[in-house]
Amino acid sequence: MATTLGFKDIVDVPKWRMEAPALAASGAGMALAWDNRNSDVSGNPYIYLLRSASALDYFDPTTGEWGALATPGLAGTFGAGATAVFHPSQGPRGTLAAGGTTTSVVLSTALPAPVGVNQLANRGDGTGFRILVANKVTGKCEIRTIVGNTAGTTPTVYIDSAVPFTAAPNASDLYEIRAGRVFMLSAGTLAAGVWKYYDIATNSYSGNLATTNLPATIGSDSNAVALSESYVSNDRKPNEGFVSGGATWDAGSGAISKNCIQATAASSTTLTGSGMPASLQANEYRNFQVRIVEDTTTPTAVGQRSRIASHTGGATGVFTVAAFGVTPSAVAKFVVENDDDKILLRSSSSTSVFCYNITANTWDVTTFSAAGAACGAGVVVEQAFGPVRDVIGNHRHSFIYNFRGGGSASIDVLDIAGGANGSWSADIAYANKSQTFGTGTCGSYAPATFDGRFIHLNINGTQRMARFDVRNRRLDAGAYLRFPQGTALVGQKMAVTTFIDGATKLDFVYHLTNSQTQMLSMIVSR
């Protein structure tokens, strides 16, 4: 039976409800991390809590209960400055071995840890993880749901026979298990092991990731945003990108067909699109990426990603990109998405934008220019990717809102497409500007409902809540928390999950109270 919502203002005032208590009281630097994909097909159901250097927990919104995971073994002195962020389109990647069929693949590149029988067929809600295969013979990318697997590090992975691949995969074709990873940052003096990830598909941790160019001492407060290619506006599906086109990809029997852009010309560094919005503005998606999702003329080009250096506007815009390893054909199909290889971090009372390059495993402070003012305790960073594309251009998917914190009412906006290194709008004007944000302030972005307009905020670790409209730049009062808070602490203590039933979507906001174990949730009914 379809879910029908009929919330009425004033009658249906949003209210907080109790969930199961966390496994320990919240402390400084604790951080919730969650999947913001607007899809029940792709999304991970859990909310993760980095509780300490030795504790990572998960919360299951479908049961309202917590569970503990193995220790991440982070280095440093866990506390103020620690944080975590979920990157939904990361996960094990590599090549396939021979022996694939239209309903199975055999991995060649080993998983980071062995999996048990059928472990990949249940992500936590009874649905399997999604696997993308880039077939270098047919030139097609296809995404399917895993329904079974053998054990080990190079298992045979089975997909639903009702939704087969259009052709059997081949040896050396590419695979990506798009289960997501939780990236975790500890605090204190910089040391090897303060930055790691948890790989969800294999229930394993990375080794020590690079830390060069991070602050010498990680402290004060931190917040990060993952530029996932799976994050799209609320009117589009993951893997369709932000820019509509006149073509489709992955349209096999029973598959979920996806919109894309049809190229009309290509070189090693350019792609000319067609059927795009006439209102597309020049460089609106600079510093995003193009991804080749189908190329039946040059099949070895499929699956490639390339960062956009610039592009012209209009329905037939030309994208200038970093050189492809294999030049796509003039009839390739592509999508325009976030640069999936990036995580952006604000931290430690710095003006820098710390940029983590996932493939290279490097940090830099030069990809994006520094802010005009340092962040402080209560910093909140969110990319406003959810609203339907604004044809006027007043709102852009390239906007990253930075609540400065440190006792300031200032919100700074980084436009990652605003120049070769982005551009900043400092201390923007917004309606109802007065409230200051300090220790205890935290937030979570809800991109799937109400046109993806709202960042939900807990104010300074108190019982007061607010929400910020990213499209219309307005701060409004949120639903009051009728439960006393403990001592305010820095850390990411807000999260979002989305209930999806067909076309019906409903966001739930979660809050872990300060210096306490209480977890509460609220239906976003308005």
Per-range role (PLM):
Residues 69-78, 89-171, 178, 208-215, ...:
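Autoprocessing Asn-cyclization modules and mimics
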Residues 31-34, 43-49, 126-134, 183-184, ...:
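Short hydrophobic/aromatic-rich beta-strand motifs
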Residues 45-50, 180-187, 233, 240-242, ...:
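Short beta-strand elements that form the blades of beta-propeller/WD-repeat-like
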Residues 488-526:
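Blade-level signature of beta-propeller repeat domains, shared across WD40, Kelch, NHL, RCC1
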Residues 11-18, 90-95, 174-183, 254-264, ...:
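Short domain-boundary/entry signatures in modular proteins, especially
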Residues 28-43, 83-90, 223-256, 381-395, ...:
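Structural signature of eukaryotic scaffold interfaces centered on beta-propeller domains
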Residues 36, 50-54, 133-138, 185-191, ...:
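Short, flexible beta-strand-to-coil junctions
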